[in-house]
């Protein structure tokens, strides 16, 4: 099984790449964490938000593996604790299917793409900068794995 993050937006600041890379490197070989960036639709006048999200959804769909469990990051998704995420990760591993976590652009994800999700999660009830999602999600997944393996990274 592998974990894939498909995120809208390219050219993130160096700290985003460094943060994501640090936790992706820590993941074990049997559970690799990869990132695929898709181009955000340019925010220009004359385009509706719906049209921009639809264009981004097309790019996201093209980046998704043929068979995977789709997990949408959404402000209305399930709010999980670290222990609950660890249990979810364990269930995903037991299912054996690759898991793709989908991060939308500045306006979110299109309703049509959201409808294809197997699950919806949210990282926080706080409003966070868009760029922070990648390293935060990578750290949360690494922490969940460390809980399952009784690794000393996570402490109760």
From Swiss-Prot:
Main location: cytoplasm
Function of the molecule: Specifically methylates the pseudouridine at position 1915 (m3Psi1915) in 23S rRNA.
UniProt GO cellular component terms: cytoplasm
UniProt protein name: Ribosomal RNA large subunit methyltransferase H
Gene3D superfamilies referenced in this protein's UniProt entry, alphabetically: 3.40.1280.10
Subcellular location per the Swiss-Prot or TrEMBL entry: Cytoplasm
UniProt KW keywords: Cytoplasm, Methyltransferase, rRNA processing, S-adenosyl-L-methionine, Transferase
SUPFAM superfamilies, alphabetized: alpha/beta knot
Positions bound to S-adenosyl-L-methionine: 73, 104, 123-128
Catalysed reaction, written as an equation: pseudouridine(1915) in 23S rRNA + S-adenosyl-L-methionine = N(3)-methylpseudouridine(1915) in 23S rRNA + S-adenosyl-L-homocysteine + H(+)
Subunit structure: Homodimer.
GO molecular function list: rRNA (pseudouridine-N3-)-methyltransferase activity
Assigned protein family: Belongs to the RNA methyltransferase RlmH family.
Transmembrane segments: none
PANTHER family, per database record: METHYLTRANSFERASE (PTHR33603), RIBOSOMAL RNA LARGE SUBUNIT METHYLTRANSFERASE H (PTHR33603:SF1)
EC code: 2.1.1.177
One Pfam family per UniProt: SPOUT_MTase
UniProt KW Transmembrane keyword: no
């Amino acid at each position: 099984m592998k974990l894939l993050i498909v995120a809208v937006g390219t050219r993130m600041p160096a700290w985003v790449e460094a943060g994501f890379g640090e936790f992706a490197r820590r993941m074990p070989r049997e559970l690799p964490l990869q990132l695929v960036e898709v181009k955000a639709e340019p925010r220009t006048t004359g385009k509706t938000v719906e049209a921009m999200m639809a264009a981004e959804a097309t790019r996201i769909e093209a980046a998704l593996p043929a068979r995977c469990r789709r997990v949408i990051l959404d402000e209305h998704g399930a709010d999980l604790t670290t222990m609950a995420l660890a249990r979810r990760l364990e269930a995903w591993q037991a299912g054996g299917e690759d898991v793709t976590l989908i991060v939308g652009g500045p306006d979110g994800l299109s309703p049509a793409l959201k409808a294809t999700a197997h699950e919806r999660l949210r990282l926080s009830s706080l409003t966070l900068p868009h760029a922070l999602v990648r390293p935060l999600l990578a750290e949360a997944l690494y922490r969940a794995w460390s809980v399952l393996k009784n690794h000393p990274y996570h402490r109760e």
